[in-house]
């Protein structure tokens, strides 16, 4: 056998045609990784890079519209959940990349690595509360349509420290959401990255 009984459609599914081919495969689709499909945004980026906690109302509305479309696709295909990346604070991306590079080079004891580790939380903290508030607003806006469609919303463990939510913010977000519809979606690879880069303990 396959060793598993279902698949997740991830954001590499860039067109309705790709999604249909996957849906016609031998295994059912259990979940969809927002946005599905993942077209090119008029903003000149992949739609998965649109920020669901953006303070730019036009970008936010575009991102929410795609998430609503993913809910509709999940309901149509009989998938039980969609997985959400809630977005990011638009600072710290270069520093996060530097941390990854230094870790892969085995330089986690270097001054450069330690300085970068300290710098990201400091920069992030300046605007994280506004972005977290927007992320909560996003989930609350998606909750009604998801409930009506019989689809769950999973807020995924983040990969980089500049992203929303971190583990403490996740707890705050979930406290503001309907637990019958919204839950925590654990990505073991993302959590392991956080532990290895020294952000948190993967337990």
Task: Label each PLM-derived region with a short phrase.
Residues 23-26, 48-50, 100-101, 171-173, ...:
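Short, hinge-like loop/turn segments at secondary-structure boundaries
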């Amino acid at each position: 056998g396959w060793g598993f009984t279902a698949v997740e459609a991830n954001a590499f599914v860039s067109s309705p045609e790709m999604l249909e081919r996957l849906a016609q495969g031998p295994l059912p689709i259990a979940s969809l990784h927002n946005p599905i499909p993942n077209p090119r945004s008029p903003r000149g980026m992949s739609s998965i890079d649109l920020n669901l906690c953006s303070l730019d109302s036009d970008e936010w509305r575009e991102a929410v519209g795609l998430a609503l479309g993913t809910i509709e696709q999940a309901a149509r295909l009989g998938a039980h959940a969609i997985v959400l990346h809630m977005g990011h604070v638009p600072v710290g991306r270069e520093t996060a990349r530097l941390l990854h590079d230094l870790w892969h080079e085995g330089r986690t004891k270097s001054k450069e690595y330690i300085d970068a580790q300290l710098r990201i939380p400091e920069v992030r903290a300046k605007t994280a509360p506004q972005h977290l508030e927007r992320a909560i607003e996003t989930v609350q806006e998606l909750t009604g349509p998801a409930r009506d469609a019989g689809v769950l919303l999973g807020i995924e463990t983040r990969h980089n420290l500049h992203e929303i939510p971190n583990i403490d913010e996740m707890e705050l977000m979930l406290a503001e959401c309907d637990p019958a519809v919204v839950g925590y979606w654990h990505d073991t690879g993302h959590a392991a990255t956080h532990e290895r880069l020294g952000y948190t303990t993967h337990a």
